[in-house]
């Protein structure tokens, strides 16, 4: 088959800039073959190389006594005691999910699950953070329904509980939705599997499903902006099969138990290319691949197609040669392909053979270690203008504006499509705050949350970055968990625009400050740039996934308020309305500065709540919508009315940070007040739970009416 001529148009279609192509010529001393061009394109794109973000990612705190393995592997590994580890990561599948919502979201779930089990962990929990355009945009309902069905279809069939996440709507996502998928798994701390190859002449083995043409060029597509050719990109979206993935999980865990594996890597972005290069690079070895041995489900596939296919449910392994028969038998038992497709070599070469031809012969290190790295120009986001006057609102009307918005309405329509109970270890299902999953066969549990407020990040990237981490810290604390570590999913627009790069830099600095102060190191993550359509970028959305530990379920704060319980706020209320949910939903204003985050207060208030958990019946962090929304959500979930005494829009709807709402039995309130005074922590009684009416500063409405609005608004907004 004749390969196309390498032209400037072909180079540009592969996402390579002229200076990058010039660098390729210098590295290999000749024009690349078509397959080599595809390999460089895949390895040097933003999605795989992090060429615009590497400089700043290196500044993040990534270590701590609890960290077994930080960024650089498939997922982060954190010690949870008793010889056990939690392995977790969050990753985006934004571009594919906009083009083909069901498969884009489904394969996002599949990919993140493989990142976890390729390290030897059995997945125990999933979350997803979703950002969509406004409900009345012509594409939004189709995308929402497809994405949610795709997540549910894959996760439910695979058999992992979805225990949390978030859903937001904003016009900035009209042309570019965000689908950030999180997975966590459990492994023995001394049985973690890594991706670095070792040993010369070791067999390189292909595992799992067959290779097709789906997803060819997917990684390159994920590093580009969208324009009016978007429909042409549909073939670059992968197709997933959760039942194959389930078999792959079981086969891999059985294989790992047989002591057959030297190293293993899932085939994700850029498929066979990226997995082989990463294994060789980390092990300082070359890799030779014979593509005739690759299991194929389509006829006449070219070397280019096989190297860049992103067909799902595939792994690459370096095998102990004496274990070939054992390993092959395991994969045959699970009805999965097992094929020796190459070997490790001592030279720094990535050698690709197909038929009797050499299709690629490249210096392997040049594909990863010497990939371009940019110090993009950036400008600091200017300080937000002071917030103008905000009219006083009827508190009930303000609450209705929030609970009637799909961003803050009850999300049962979403999570009822997800299985949150499979594996029978879910202690706290999606709904309010962090999800909690029991560590099977132990007294321990793990808590999971995902958080970011993009409006804050746009107004003030540094404070917005801090706030995403602080809110995750509070959500874990509010269920009684000690925060352990974080994963970041950095979703931004075009980094070649200095103002966008400035948002990224500011957010990284804020995240770094917060994870250091709160002892929640970043152990894994993902960067998704070029989230723009026709030059219009998304809101900067640095999603933080976080994991916390309960050493015993006795530490869990899982109750609901009861009739007559007091409502108290831990922390200081100053009434910050800048960039608040109320301002956006009721007045259509996104103005003012983001709320400042006092990290020392966050730590002190969180430690206070965990130390006094036995005195409270329920807890929630105060964030979007302030006291009024948090108190309503807590009361409504318990089927109770509510009376709040603070008056004024700012006191009820302000979004000051480092605050928690707690429900406390009246006979325990005095002890909690005494503990707060002793700890120097502000604690204010703000009302009472009970009855069948919601009363905010004297304005009232029946709980039943508000509950009906709250529980119907989401489905009505998207025509569900």
Curated annotation (Swiss-Prot):
Its EC number is 6.3.5.3. The keyword Acyltransferase does not apply. Keywords: ATP-binding, Cytoplasm, Ligase, Magnesium, Metal-binding, Nucleotide-binding, Purine biosynthesis. One of its GO terms (biological process) is 'de novo' IMP biosynthetic process. Coiled coil: none annotated. Mg(2+) 2 binds at residues 115, 266. Substrate binds at residues 92-95, 114, 238, 310-312, 528. It comes from the Bacteria. Part of the phosphoribosylformylglycinamidine synthase complex involved in the purines biosynthetic pathway. Catalyzes the ATP-dependent conversion of formylglycinamide ribonucleotide (FGAR) and glutamine to yield formylglycinamidine ribonucleotide (FGAM) and glutamate. The FGAM synthase complex is composed of three subunits. PurQ produces an ammonia molecule by converting glutamine to glutamate. PurL transfers the ammonia molecule to FGAR to form FGAM in an ATP-dependent manner. This is Phosphoribosylformylglycinamidine synthase subunit PurL. It comes from Cereibacter sphaeroides (strain ATCC 17023 / DSM 158 / JCM 6121 / CCUG 31486 / LMG 2827 / NBRC 12203 / NCIMB 8253 / ATH 2.4.1.). The lineage of its organism: Bacteria, Pseudomonadati, Pseudomonadota, Alphaproteobacteria, Rhodobacterales. The gene is purL.
């Amino acid at each position: 088959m004749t390969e196309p001529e390498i032209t400037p148009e072909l180079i540009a279609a592969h996402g390579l800039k002229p200076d990058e192509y010039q660098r390729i010529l210098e590295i290999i001393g000749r024009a690349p073959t078509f397959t080599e061009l595809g390999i460089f394109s895949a390895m040097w794109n933003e999605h795989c190389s992090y060429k615009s973000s590497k400089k700043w990612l290196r500044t993040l705190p990534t270590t701590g006594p609890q960290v077994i393995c930080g960024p650089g592997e498939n997922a982060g590994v954190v010690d949870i005691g008793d010889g056990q580890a939690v392995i977790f990561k969050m990753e985006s599948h934004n571009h594919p999910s906009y083009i083909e919502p069901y498969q884009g979201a489904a394969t996002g779930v599949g990919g993140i699950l493989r990142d976890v089990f390729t390290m030897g962990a059995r997945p125990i929990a999933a979350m997803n953070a979703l950002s969509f355009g406004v409900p009345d945009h012509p594409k939004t309902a189709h995308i929402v329904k497809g994405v949610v069905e795709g997540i549910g279809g894959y996760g439910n069939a695979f058999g992992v509980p979805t225990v949390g996440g978030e859903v937001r709507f904003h016009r900035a996502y009209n042309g570019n939705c965000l689908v950030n998928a999180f997975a966590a798994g459990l492994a023995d701390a001394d049985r973690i599997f890594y991706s670095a190859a070792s040993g010369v002449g070791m067999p390189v083995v292909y595992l799992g499903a067959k290779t097709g043409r789906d997803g060819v060029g997917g990684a390159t597509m994920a590093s580009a902006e969208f324009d009016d050719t978007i429909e042409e990109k549909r073939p670059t979206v992968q197709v997933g099969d959760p039942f194959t993935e389930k078999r792959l999980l079981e086969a891999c865990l059985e294989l790992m138990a047989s002591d057959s594996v030297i190293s293993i890597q899932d085939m994700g972005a850029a498929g066979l290319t990226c997995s082989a290069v990463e294994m060789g690079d980390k092990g300082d070895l070359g890799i030779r691949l014979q593509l005739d041995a690759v299991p194929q489900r389509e006829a006449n596939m070219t070397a280019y197609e096989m190297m860049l296919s992103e067909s799902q449910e595939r792994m690459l392994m370096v095998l102990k040669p004496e274990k070939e028969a054992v390993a092959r038998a395991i994969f045959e038992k699970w009805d999965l392909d097992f094929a020796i497709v190459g070997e490790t070599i001592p030279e720094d070469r990535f050698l690709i053979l197909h038929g009797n031809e050499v299709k690629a012969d490249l210096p392997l290190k040049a594909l990863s270690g010497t990939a371009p790295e940019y110090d993009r120009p950036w400008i600091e986001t200017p300080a937000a203008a002071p917030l103008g006057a905000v009219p006083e609102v009827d508190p009930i009307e303000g609450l209705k504006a929030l609970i009637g918005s799909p961003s803050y309405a009850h999300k049962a329509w979403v999570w009822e499509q997800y299985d949150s109970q499979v594996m029978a270890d879910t202690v706290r299902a999606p709904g309010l705050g962090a999800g909690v999953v029991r560590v099977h066969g132990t007294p321990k549990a793990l808590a999971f949350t995902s958080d970011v407020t993009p409006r804050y990040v746009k107004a003030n990237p540094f404070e917005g970055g801090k706030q995403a981490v602080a809110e995750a810290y509070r959500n874990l604390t509010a269920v009684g968990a000690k925060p352990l570590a974080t994963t970041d999913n950095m979703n931004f627009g075009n980094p070649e625009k200095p103002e966008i790069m400035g948002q990224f830099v500011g957010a990284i600095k804020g995240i770094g400050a917060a994870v250091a102060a709160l002892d929640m190191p970043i152990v894994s993550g993902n960067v998704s740039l070029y989230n723009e359509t026709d030059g219009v970028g998304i809101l900067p959305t640095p999603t933080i996934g976080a994991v916390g530990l309960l050493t015993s379920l006795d530490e869990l704060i899982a109750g609901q308020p009861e009739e007559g319980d007091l409502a108290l706020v831990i922390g200081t209320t100053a009434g910050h309305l800048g960039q608040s949910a109320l301002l956006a939903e009721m007045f259509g204003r996104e103005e003012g500065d983001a709320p400042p985050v006092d990290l020392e207060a966050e730590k002190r208030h969180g430690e206070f709540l965990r130390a006094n958990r036995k005195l409270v019946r329920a807890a929630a962090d105060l964030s979007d919508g302030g006291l009024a929304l948090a108190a309503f959500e807590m009361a409504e979930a318990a089927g109770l009315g509510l009376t709040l005494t603070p008056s004024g829009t700012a006191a009820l709807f302000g979004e000051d940070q480092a605050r928690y709402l707690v429900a406390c039995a009246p006979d325990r309130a005095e002890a909690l007040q005494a503990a707060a005074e002793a700890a120097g922590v502000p604690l204010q009684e703000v009302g009472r739970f009970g009855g069948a009416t919601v009363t905010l500063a004297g304005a009232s409405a029946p709980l039943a009416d508000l509950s009906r609005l709250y529980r119907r608004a989401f489905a009505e907004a998207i025509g569900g």
